[in-house]
Regions:
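A surface/extracellular/periplasmic glyco- and lipid-processing/surface-interacting theme
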Residues: 1-214
Length: 214
């Protein structure tokens, strides 16, 4: 949206713009897909772009990891959580859902009535952790239906892993800070090693998400 472009083109974000053409040299189009949803880049291209633009690649001295993780031999089992074998998300068109596989301990994602496949690997998307982050939302542009999602005010959510789910809260001190997630007793959540899927959920639709023991 034009609102996102305003933010991307500000000094707040190190931006490699492949939308308006400024950084077009670092992107390519996959002609097997329909434009405009066929623009891609690579890690090598982004590294080259950062060098070209002179972006700082060093972490600040006070940097801390975005997430906290357990070790492989000390899994967070969420013993007090509700059973979460299926997680159905309320999106009118895609109607996505996750199904828990007890054999490998991963959640496999589906949408549009079928498996969601990673185009680069040919494999179904699967993650170890799911975070549902409930956010306030409003219409920024009623004509085009552009949503304004509030990522700063904090709120509720769910943490899902190993076939269980627990309620959480989330906070973000400022736009320059990272989002932190907490258990109901105020402890920062400990994720299990593996991929983590953060699902942004509008507060108005959060009650329509379903976590079940199916």
């Amino acid at each position: 949206s034009k609102y996102a472009l305003d933010v991307l083109n500000s000094s707040f974000i190190d931006n490699v713009d492949g939308i308006t053409g400024k950084g077009g040299a670092f992107y390519y189009r996959d002609n097997s897909r329909r434009a405009p949803h066929n623009l891609y880049t690579t890690g090598e291209n982004l590294a080259s772009a950062m060098k070209t633009y002179g972006y700082d690649t060093k972490l600040p001295e006070n940097y801390t990891s975005h997430y906290r993780f357990t070790t492989e031999d000390s899994q967070n089992l969420l013993d007090q959580g509700e059973v979460a074998k299926k997680v159905s998300l309320y999106y009118v068109d895609a109607k996505p859902w996750f199904v828990y596989n007890e054999t490998d301990g991963l959640y496999y994602r589906y949408e549009f009535g079928d498996k969601q496949i990673d185009g680069s690997t040919g494999e179904q998307l699967a993650v170890k952790n799911i975070i549902l982050q409930n956010c306030y939302s409003s219409l920024k542009d009623s004509k085009n239906g552009t949503l304004d999602i509030d990522y700063l005010s904090g709120g509720s959510g769910m943490y899902i892993t190993n076939g269980k789910a627990v309620p959480i809260t989330w906070k973000r001190a400022s736009a320059n800070d990272i989002t932190r997630y907490y258990t109901q007793d105020g402890q920062e959540i400990i994720l299990n090693p593996g991929k983590t899927w953060v699902e942004i959920v509008e507060n108005s639709r959060a009650s329509q998400n379903k976590i079940s023991a199916e």
